[in-house]
């Protein structure tokens, strides 16, 4: 953020949000490459010499507005290998810098102003770490849940309209439209069959991640506005959404599906115990309300997507579950509310009687079937969960093979340490342990039985530790009773940095 403040002269940008001139600045692409998670396409081109000048950017933008791309590349491919190597390289080049530039208006609003307004307060923004206290403290007291899959296919023009408030110069919006069309035509992996623009996280670049987040932010801003049943929002960060172009016109269009009276429509969804949680492309609405209220919310969400985003959303994308009877697959856990029966003896004068009492308790389980499917996809076992060797790693040294298997096992154990039952996790450890043994036996051209017998019981001892070692570091002076109490469920705050199973492939 300090680099942006130093180079971009935020005082002038903050007044008009004119971003188009920044496209012609060389340092923009250096900053974009520095902050981007993916390597820049330009830096991988050996003929480019790791530079992007004003003249090249101007030529790229000029070529983008030509009507016949084939004639241009046919004439210039022999003269300029930079443009002739890949037909859509120019649009990807501009996309690298434009994805960084279009985020500037969002960065500006997160910077405390120098006029003494202080730090921006946001009451409705929460991190992933707030999910765990929510599960522990509130989940067991709720009854119904709406399991929502956020639609990922959005019309191109709707994405541009969502950014009209943040990016006000017309040139940048036209350039954004062109980049959309190029991505739609050149990359079928991110284009839907009809008119929508699909988001594939593993295939997307930084611009697509930003567009998807802005789309979800737009969806949540109006959703939270209607949820709060107020003409203004409590959070300062959400207040800017009330000033968007045609905002109130969109609100009136939304409520037409329920009734003409705006206040009467909002009263139908009044619920003081409604909780909204989103993680990646999935969100949940949890409430103490009746099934009738949850059906109203389901009907509202389907019509909300169809009327505001012009999306045909099937009602099957929103599931209604009762927590005491169903499990919720969320953030890698199968969460449910389990009734823990208990019996209390009560005595009044000379009479004594027994009272049956059921206490609701949060139950988090490891989803064994999806994990086995992930292991099978990564070639650690078959679909039935039987361990197999990893031929791709057979050429590594013994220590490297053990380290890779051990790292995956530690990551899984660390992430699923919040599970209340560890039996499924032990099965996953067993699969990885035996797969490692089979890989080493394959390398040394031996059988697994002979290989394990030769190494003894000390082989792969790191697969059997993990929770106990981490717990001893977390609570070094705790008693055995205290440690036993916390061994059942521990939420670690660094699980978002854990690599998945496919990182070593």
Swiss-Prot record:
Keywords: Chloroplast, mRNA processing, Plastid, RNA-binding, tRNA processing. It is found in: Plastid, Chloroplast. One of its GO terms (cellular component) is chloroplast. Signal peptide: none annotated. One of its GO terms (biological process) is tRNA processing. GO terms for molecular function: RNA binding. Usually encoded in the trnK tRNA gene intron. Probably assists in splicing its own and other chloroplast group II introns. PANTHER family: MATURASE K. Belongs to the intron maturase 2 family. MatK subfamily. This is Maturase K. It comes from Chiococca alba (West Indian milkberry).
């Amino acid at each position: 953020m300090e680099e942006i403040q130093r180079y971009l002269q935020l005082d002038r940008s903050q007044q008009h949000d004119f971003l188009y001139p920044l496209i012609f600045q060389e340092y923009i692409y250096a900053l974009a490459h520095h902050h981007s998670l993916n390597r820049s396409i330009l830096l991988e081109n050996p003929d480019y010499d790791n530079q992007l000048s004003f003249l090249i950017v101007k030529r790229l933008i000029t070529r983008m507005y030509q009507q016949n791309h084939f004639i241009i590349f046919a004439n210039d491919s022999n003269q300029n290998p930079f443009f002739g190597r890949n037909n859509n390289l120019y649009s990807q080049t501009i996309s690298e810098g434009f994805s960084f530039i279009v985020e500037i208006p969002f960065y500006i609003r997160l910077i405390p102003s120098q006029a003494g307004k202080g730090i921006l307060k946001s009451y409705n923004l929460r991190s992933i770490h707030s999910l765990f206290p929510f599960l522990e403290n509130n989940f067991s007291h709720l009854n119904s849940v709406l399991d929502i899959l956020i639609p990922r296919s959005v019309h191109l023009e709707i994405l541009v309209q969502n950014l009209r408030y943040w990016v006000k110069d017309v040139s940048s919006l036209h350039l954004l439209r062109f980049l959309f069309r190029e991505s739609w035509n050149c990359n079928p992996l991110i284009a839907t069959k009809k008119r929508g623009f699909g988001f594939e996280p593993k295939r997307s670049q930084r611009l697509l991640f930003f567009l998807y987040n802005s789309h979800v932010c737009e969806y949540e801003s109006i959703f939270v506005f209607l949820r709060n049943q107020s003409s203004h929002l409590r959070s300062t960060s959400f207040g800017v959404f009330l000033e968007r172009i045609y905002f109130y016109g969109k609100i009136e269009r939304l409520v037409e599906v329920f009734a003409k009276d705006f206040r009467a429509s909002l009263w139908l969804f009044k619920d003081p115990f409604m909780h909204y949680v989103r993680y990646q492309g999935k969100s949940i609405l949890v409430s103490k309300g009746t099934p009738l209220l949850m059906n109203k919310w389901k009907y509202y969400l389907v019509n909300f997507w169809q009327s505001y985003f012009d999306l045909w959303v099937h009602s099957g994308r929103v599931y209604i579950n009762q927590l005491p009877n169903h499990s919720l697959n969320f953030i890698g856990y199968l969460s449910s509310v389990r009734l823990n029966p208990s019996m209390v003896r009560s005595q009044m004068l000379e009479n004594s009687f027994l009272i049956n009492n059921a206490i609701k308790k949060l139950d988090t389980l490891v989803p064994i079937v999806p994990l086995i499917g992930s292991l099978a996809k990564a070639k650690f076992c078959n679909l039935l969960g039987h361990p197999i060797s990893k031929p791709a790693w057979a050429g590594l040294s013994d220590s490297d093979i053990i380290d890779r298997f051990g790292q995956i096992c530690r990551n899984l154990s660390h992430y699923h340490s919040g599970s209340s039952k560890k039996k499924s996790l032990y099965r996953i450890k067993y699969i990885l342990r035996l797969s490692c043994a089979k890989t080493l036996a394959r390398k040394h051209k031996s059988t697994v039985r002979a290989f394990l017998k030769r190494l003894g019981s000390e082989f792969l001892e790191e697969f059997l530790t993990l929770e106990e070692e981490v717990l001893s570091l977390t609570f070094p002076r705790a008693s055995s009773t205290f440690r036993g109490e916390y061994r059942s469920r521990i939420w670690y705050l660094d699980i978002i940095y854990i690599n998945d199973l496919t990182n070593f492939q």
